[in-house]
Amino acid sequence: MISDLISKLQEKTDLTYDEMNQVMTDVLSGKTTDSENADFLSNLTDKGETDDELLGMLDKMQEFSLKIEPKNTGTIIDMCGTGGDKLQTFNISTTASFVVAAAGGVVAKHGNRSSSGISGSADIFEYFGYDLNLEPPKIAEILEKHNICFMFAQKFHPAMKHVSVARKQLGKRTAFNLLGPLSNPAKVKNQLVGVFSIEYLDRLPLILKRKGAQNIMTVRSDDGMDEFSTSSTNRVCVLRDDKVLMNAIDPEVVGLHKSSLTDIQIQTKEDAIESFVGVLNNTANQAMIETTALNAAGGLIVANISNNFEEAVELALNTIKDGKAFSLLEKFVQDTGDISKLKEIADG
């Protein structure tokens, strides 16, 4: 089956939803070889994925994944980027997730170790002693108690191990980079997603709309980040009430200072940890704090807590300045990890 579809892709012929869904059953069951998988993914990337193809893959990924059943009432969101911007910035969406949760949102964070950056969200949670292999019911409890949790992609998507060799061999972006952030195990209907390419800005909301999404915001900054940036204008696409709207967000217009990309870049895993804690306890540089606030603002709008960016940025900054964000981190680490690790960084 897969060899026929590889031939089709080589001829630049699009696959149907059903063809993709069927071949993904074989791929994620381990019935195909590493070289077939690499060939398939490479040719798919070269052809360019259609929405039907992406949806066929996404539905099958979710069918094969573990799930969590959140007990929280109200809007549950996720916020993350597709990664791969190679800009070596600090962990913006992870930091912003704690700000959103401290400001009254509920964030079911889904993430992984870093693929092309210095530190991924999993690296941060793990550093503070969070068990990446927690079972779904325990994670649902953590979410209910703290309004934030972390679901490790490798734990929740065990079938993805069948494509890990092929993805490493290829060493380039494939459809899975795009679909990872969309395959949240808590089945969230409200998401902020940073994208690595402008072409996906309006495509992802439309794909997620077909899956019953409610509020989706995608972002790409003009300086190349798959997150909101305070060093340039940000292109934003919003799905709300079944309508898709494009917008541009200028950081200075929403009350922030223009910064430079170098202000938020890091070089080591230690830098990543220190930046994460530094923002939440309000000791990091202005650019890191304001970049986090702008990304948290996107999350607060998606979570139906704020109506516009000006209001949301102010709420995010106040949540950091009045100590609520750091207080949540302390309680979270006390409950799920090793508080001495946090004290060491915070007091350092």
Curated annotation (Swiss-Prot):
GO cellular component, one term: cytosol
Entry binding sites for Mg(2+) 2: 226-227
Any matching Pfam family: Glycos_trans_3N
Binding, 5-phospho-alpha-D-ribose 1-diphosphate: 81, 84-85, 89, 91-94, 109-117, 121
Residue positions binding anthranilate 2: 167
Keywords: Amino-acid biosynthesis, Aromatic amino acid biosynthesis, Glycosyltransferase, Magnesium, Metal-binding, Transferase, Tryptophan biosynthesis
Listed GO biological process terms: L-tryptophan biosynthetic process
Residues where anthranilate 1 binds: 81, 112
Requisite cofactors: Mg(2+)
Similarity section: Belongs to the anthranilate phosphoribosyltransferase family.
Protein name (record): Anthranilate phosphoribosyltransferase
Organism: Nitrosopumilus maritimus (strain SCM1)
Classification lineage: Archaea, Nitrososphaerota, Nitrososphaeria, Nitrosopumilales, Nitrosopumilaceae
